[in-house]
Amino acid sequence: MFIPQMIQKGGGGVINVGSTASFLPVPFASVYSASKAFVLMFSDAIRYEYQDKNIQVMTLCPGGTASKFSEVASEKSSDALKTLNQVLKEKGQLGDSCELVAREGLDAFLKNKSSFITGKGNKKFAFLPRILSRDRIIKLTGDIFRKRVAK
């Protein structure tokens, strides 16, 4: 981490990249969604720990993004990531460009946001846990992914 150097310089900032999967359990992509949830919680914790040192920490949570990730996930990654990529393509969630995600993320960071969900329609993923039970969310996401894994 670069925290010690930031403290020496009187402050700094970190943008960690989470995902809309940070907010939901995603069966058949469990390691991916769990790791992105970790990024969100870790960032929240270190933001609090270093707030008095003038260090800003934000978690950027994009949805599907049109990037090389989709190609790499299709060619070299686990079945779970291939499945996640396929679902995002089918749902039309790979439409946001990397440039748009970066621009929205930097704008949010400059406004001192603690986290930011990029793209149109992606905020709904963060709100689902507020209106649906965990069991219902797991069933919904599991049913979507199960169909792809079975292929």
What is each PLM-predicted segment?
Residues 19:
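Residue(s) in the substrate-gating loop at a strand-loop-helix junction
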Residues 5, 24, 45-55:
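Active-site-adjacent segment of SDR/Rossmann-fold oxidoreductases
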Residues 38-50, 60, 69:
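Hydrophobic alpha-helix immediately C-terminal to the catalytic Tyr-X-X-X-Lys motif of short-chain
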Residues 26-30:
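Active-site loop immediately N-terminal to the catalytic Tyr-X3-Lys motif
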Residues 52-120:
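SDR active-site lid
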Residues 112-144:
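A transmembrane-helix-recognition feature enriched in membrane-embedded lipid enzymes
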Residues 1-10:
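A short helix-coil junction within the Rossmann-fold of NAD(P)-dependent oxidoreductases
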Residues 35:
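Active-site helix of classical SDR
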